[in-house]
Amino acid sequence: MDRPQNVKDLARKVKDNLSFSREVRGMDFEKEWDFMAIMRSFETMGFQGSNLYRAVEEIERMKNSKIFFGCTSNIISSGLRDVIATLVKRRHVHVLVITGGGIEEDIIKAFKPTFCADFRLDGAELRDNGLNRIGNLVIPSENYEHLESWLNNIVNDITEGYTAERPRILTPSSFIRILGERIDDESSILYWAAKNDIPVYSPAVVDGSLGDILSFHPRRKMLKLDIVEDVYRINCETIFCGETAAIILGCGVVKHHILNANLFKNGLEHCVLINNAQEFDGSDAGASLDEAVSWGKVKPGTRGVKVFGDATILFPLLVGATFMRKDKDVPKGE
């Protein structure tokens, strides 16, 4: 190869079979603007801004589908609990999958607050003061004491008349339904799920304080949680169903549980993921949607999207631009 003499030589264009027409453009704040104008500007922003716009389009496409919503416990610890509760209250989502920590966080917040703090607080100092840090949030240990007292009373009630030899058998989703019916607080996700008959699945429900409290309870042998029956139930949520869709904040067990259930109908038609996990360690948490296609959990040719970023920033924008919008001049997902 000859030594390049100019920029044209360096560029070395030898083919002409690719073309692009959509120019990169950002928000023009010198023109009249509103929230939806900002959201529409993400289409040509590039990087995760453009993926966020694609997520808006995908949610528009899924609105007539059965929507599975999943999230991890830290999502419920944050202010996103209020956003999710609104979606459940208005029946915008139809099946929930939440980690055990998320179940207990929702219950606790119905009685006691979580506080904003700082990522850099000293762990030992927090421990001595009876405070537990979740990122830049803190939860007083006394909140868990209140949860224990509340849950113990419920276990006493629901195991009345049962024995260790003939225990009461509940699926985790049935148990969670009972908890939701006992909550008298409209800020709660479980409250609205029970009220609107929206199932809440939690395959790892005992991985956290709920499991600890149940294990401490003197009547623990009188209550059995049937996890296998719940796997059957969530799989049946998809069989013979029309179009299904998923919105998943975070990853791990909630992501796999939703995607695996949709394997039983040959895959989701629509999907939006928001997380920061990478696929390079082979984990399901970081796996791309295309990998899910290879397992039959997402249908080929779908326009699902994964947005890399912090759900506490991204999800309120998505909800405001789709489920809760007032401005109708938005993408129709076509």
Swiss-Prot record:
GO molecular function list: deoxyhypusine synthase activity
Catalytic residues of the enzyme: 297
Gene3D superfamilies given in the database record: Deoxyhypusine synthase
Superkingdom, taxonomy of origin: Eukaryota
Pfam families membership: DS (PF01916)
Chain sites annotated for binding spermidine: 104-105, 212, 256, 282-284, 291-297
Catalysed reaction, written as an equation: [eIF5A protein]-L-lysine + spermidine = [eIF5A protein]-deoxyhypusine + propane-1,3-diamine
Heme found in the keyword field: no
Cofactor(s), by name: NAD(+)
Pathway annotation from the record: Protein modification; eIF5A hypusination
Binding site residues for NAD(+): 73-77, 99-101, 105, 207, 276-277, 310-311
Gene Ontology terms: cellular component: cytoplasm
Signal sequence extent: none
Family annotation (InterPro entries): Deoxyhypusine_synthase, Deoxyhypusine_synthase_sf, DHS-like_NAD/FAD-binding_dom
Disulfide bonds: none
EC number: 2.5.1.46
Alphabetized UniProt keyword annotations: Hypusine biosynthesis, NAD, Transferase
Purpose: Catalyzes the NAD-dependent oxidative cleavage of spermidine and the subsequent transfer of the butylamine moiety of spermidine to the epsilon-amino group of a specific lysine residue of the eIF-5A precursor protein to form the intermediate deoxyhypusine residue.
NCBIfam families: dhys
Similarity comment: family membership: Belongs to the deoxyhypusine synthase family.
Designated name of the protein: Deoxyhypusine synthase
